[in-house]
A protein has these predicted regions:
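Non-heme Fe(II) oxygenase metal-center motifs and adjacent flexible, charged/small-residue loops
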Residues: 1-220
Length: 220
């Protein structure tokens, strides 16, 4: 299930408006942010400011948030960061099993918007709520066996502007991008195999952020 069409003649780049079916007149995707071994595209204006504000407010007040849990050194640890998992199947990562909750109307609305922009159908979504810059995410990759291998991952950012970093597993080369309110980041191809990514903590950030990561789960 390819996320972006192949470009056999090199005549188009991810910035071309028609490559991702961007018929809404919004911002175009960037060119590939990675130097190789994967594909990452960024679009700053997926949602207009009023729409992004409305979505952010609706999600913050959602009743689906739960404290995230991880298993470290055989012990279960409850994190301050809130999360929610939407989909038909449970999702296991960091040693803990996340049970799905019923799809929320606002999440479905954003899912439809992302699918329209990216040309792919997603069947699950992981939400993370970062209260401020004291909460972040360390180096990791989204390569769980329950996910479609080399499948697309689409990340929508709402709220505080945060830096997002990629690091190549072998060369340790790093790439960073600032994720704006209402933006979309697309990861596809072999990105998860060759790169890890992180959301660094920052005491300068005092506002909350909500991140929606749309994924494709394997059918059982």
């Amino acid at each position: 299930m390819p996320f972006a069409p192949q470009i056999p003649d090199g005549s188009k780049t991810p910035g071309d408006p028609d490559l991702f079916g961007l018929s809404d007149g919004g911002e175009a995707f960037s060119k590939n942010l990675l130097p190789g071994d994967g594909r990452v595209f960024y679009r700053s204006g997926l949602l207009e400011q009023p729409v992004a504000d409305e979505s952010f407010k609706a999600l913050l007040s959602g009743g689906f948030w739960r404290n995230d849990e991880v298993v470290m050194f055989g012990r279960r640890r409850v994190l301050s960061r809130k999360m929610a998992w939407f989909g038909d199947l449970p999702y296991a990562y960091a040693g803990a099993l996340k049970q799905p909750v019923p799809w929320d109307a606002e999440v479905l609305r954003l899912k439809s918007r992302v699918e329209q922009a990216g040309g792919c159908v997603f069947n699950s979504c992981l939400l993370n709520h970062y209260a401020d810059g004291r909460e972040g995410m360390g180096w990791h990759s989204d390569d769980e066996s329950s996910l479609l291998p080399n499948g697309p991952i689409a990340s929508v950012s709402l709220g505080a502007r945060r830096v997002f970093r990629f690091k190549h597993r072998r060369t340790l080369e790093q790439v960073e991008v600032w994720l704006e309110h209402g933006s979309l980041l697309l990861m596809e191809g072999e990105t998860q195999s060759h790169w890890v990514h992180a959301l660094p903590k920052s005491l300068r950030v005092r506002e909350p952020r909500v991140n929606l990561t749309f994924r494709v789960m394997r059918e059982p």
